[in-house]
Structure formats: C-alpha cells, structure tokens
Amino acid sequence: MSKVKSITRESWILSTFPEWGSWLNEEIEQEQVAPGTFAMWWLGCTGIWLKSEGGTNVCVDFWCGTGKQSHGNPLMKQGHQMQRMAGVKKLQPNLRTTPFVLDPFAIRQIDAVLATHDHNDHIDVNVAAAVMQNCADDVPFIGPKTCVDLWIGWGVPKERCIVVKPGDVVKVKDIEIHALDAFDRTALITLPADQKAAGVLPDGMDDRAVNYLFKTPGGSLYHSGDSHYSNYYAKHGNEHQIDVALGSYGENPRGITDKMTSADMLRMGEALNAKVVIPFHHDIWSNFQADPQEIRVLWEIKKDRLKYGFKPFIWQVGGKFTWPLDKDNFEYHYPRGFDDCFTIEPDLPFKSFL
C-alpha cells in the first residue's frame, strides 16, 4: 500500500498530537530547582505546574480540552453562564488558540493535583485518568467541593480527594497550600439549565471556588483562578507575603464581564503587595483575545506616580518562570538555541556563505 493510502485522519492525529509531545514533561522532570527559588511552567489557560527546591511537583487547573469545533449548532447552550450574564442566544465563538504543551499521559512524578473551580477549562477528566493510571496511588486531588464532586463522579476514590475552603491549609511535602477566598462571580451563575438565577440568592462561593497561595521554601505564588477584581485582594496582601501573583486577564466582549482588565491587573498587584504580576487566561479563547502589553504600558504610565512595588511579566505558554531569578525580567522568550555555534567547523563551500 502506498504511503498516501495508508495515512488516515487517526494516524495524522496520533503523529502530531499533543503538539509538544513529551518535551515539556521531560524538561520539568530534569529541572533541578536551586535552593531559595521555585520554578513554574505555564500550561495554558490558568494551568500551572509548580516545582519546589525539594522537588515537590503540583499542578493546578491543568486542562486538556478544547473549545468550539463546529458551526453545527448556532445557539448557545441553554442556561449557560454567559447566556445568564448577558441575555444572549447566539453560539459563543470561543475557539482554543493555544497548543497542548504537556502530555498528561507522560506524567510520572507528581505530588498533588489541584483545581480552583469546576468550569470545564480548569479541571480535566483526562488529567485525572492519567494520574490515576500512571502515577503513585497516594497522589491527592485537592479542590473545593464542586471539584471533588466531579473527580469522584469520574471515578477518583473519595479517599484520594481533599475538599478545601477558604482558611484551610494542606501540606504537600515542602509546599504549604493555603486555600483563600475566590472572587469568581461567574461561578455563582453556573447552574443546571433548568435552574433560574433571577431573584434567587446564590449559594456561597466557598463550595464552588477558591484561590490558592503556594508557600514554598523559595518563595510564594498566588493563583487567583478565574477571580475578578475584588477589594478583598488587599486583605490577602495584608495577611500573606506574596512574591508572584497570577491573574485572569482578557478582553471582555460587549455585554460581558468575565476577565480582569489591564487596570484590574495593576490594582490586583498593588492590593496583594506582590513583587511580580503575571497575566494568564488571555491565551486560550479566541473571543477574549487581549494584548498583555497593555498591562505593561499602563504600568509604565502609573508606576512612578503611584510608587508601584511590583513589575508585570509577560509570559508564553510552555515557558518557565523562576523566582526570584526572573523577577526583574519583563518578557519571556522561548530558548533560541544555537548557543554552541562554531564548536565544530562549519561545512560550507567558502566563508562568504557566512
């Protein structure tokens, strides 16, 4: 059989997906985190892999799904939170724009799986399956009640799950995980399709969503999940030392308030007394596309007048950030390679080729 006749759609998908293969899995496994630091990698959306100086590995909000893939149904799902928010009927054109940079089924070394809330782009059945099948049988799944309910429904044993609410602290080796208040108002109107939100007092946020503060021996990381801006960030900043803060940023479509703006990101950094503020989530959805450089431009305008004590950092999906080594950098660039140029003699017809 000729090559073109033996190739199928399935063989094409298996040969190209996930786009990064196990490259990032291998990089994370090989990383030796120096004392007094922590390393983290952006997995897309709000997915983060955190590794401490003691070699503790935790992932939070690692999601391996996709967005819209067809024009087949022109209408939004009945009762969707965006429909409730803005009274819309048309399909939301949210296509996934970020490649898959980590293979969940190539994960072997992990000490905890966490989720901030139960929205589809923050918790993933494939990740749960991969960890259950390929990793140690004592890896905990940590999240608010709605997330634990999902995991148990997927088949994760109840004894492997830890329900957290604001004020709880979970120790995973040398990382201390503090569950803090979340400010994700969209989560409160994520309801069964037949349930009305109008005129009904919403249930509490604590069962639905939490923010996390990861305290490592080398520094602290604040993960805000899908939280909107809240004055309460200042309380968190008063109560905890926060080195790096991650915030969900995006260009909200007309009639929608679901992501923080550039001004919100700066207010969050100031309120938390953070040293570095990093936007995320803006990478993933085509209809929330936003330019993170806007945050830096606004920071430049305000920093001297308002005496900001933090800097913004513009990241790339799949990239590594090391605290405090990268604290004075403003932008990430993927490794460019070719650092070993001219370690062997070039093979060229003559030097003018150079």
From Swiss-Prot:
Main location: cytoplasm
Enzymatic reactions: L-ascorbate 6-phosphate + H2O = 3-dehydro-L-gulonate 6-phosphate
Hydrolase is among the record's keywords: yes
GO terms, biological process: L-ascorbic acid catabolic process
InterPro entries named in the record: L-ascorbate_6P_UlaG, Metallo-B-lactamas, RibonucZ/Hydroxyglut_hydro, UlaG-like_MBL-fold, UPF0173_UPF0282_UlaG_hydrolase
GO CC terms in record: cytoplasm
Family statement: Belongs to the UlaG family.
Name of the protein this chain belongs to: Probable L-ascorbate-6-phosphate lactonase UlaG
Known function: Probably catalyzes the hydrolysis of L-ascorbate-6-P into 3-keto-L-gulonate-6-P. Is essential for L-ascorbate utilization under anaerobic conditions.
Alphabetical UniProt keywords: Cytoplasm, Hydrolase
Membrane among keywords: no
EC number: 3.1.1.-
GO molecular function: L-ascorbate 6-phosphate lactonase activity; manganese ion binding
Pfam families, per the entry: Lactamase_B_2
Protein's cellular compartments: Cytoplasm
Pathway: Cofactor degradation; L-ascorbate degradation; D-xylulose 5-phosphate from L-ascorbate: step 1/4
Induction / repression: Induced by L-ascorbate. Repressed by UlaR.
Cofactor dependency: a divalent metal cation
Gene3D superfamilies (alphabetical): Ribonuclease Z/Hydroxyacylglutathione hydrolase-like (3.60.15.10)
